[in-house]
Curated annotation (Swiss-Prot):
Annotated GO biological process: photosynthesis
SUPFAM superfamilies xrefs: Photosystem II reaction center protein J, PsbJ (SSF161021)
Gene that this sequence comes from: psbJ
Origin species: Gloeothece citriformis (strain PCC 7424)
GO (cellular component) term, any one: plasma membrane-derived thylakoid membrane
Protein name in the entry: Photosystem II reaction center protein J
Length: 39
């Protein structure tokens, strides 16, 4: 996929950041929409 042997650090940081934001967003969305029923 990349010409280099390893993935650039900024690509890993962006993917990790988006993953964390997605998990936190889904958690708060589930808590808000479920009003505690998901717990």
């Amino acid at each position: 996929m990349f010409a280099e042997g390893r993935i650039p650090l900024w690509v890993v940081a962006v993917i990790a950041g988006l993953g964390v934001i997605a998990v936190v967003g889904l958690f708060f969305y589930g808590a808000y929409a479920g009003l505690g029923s998901s717990l």
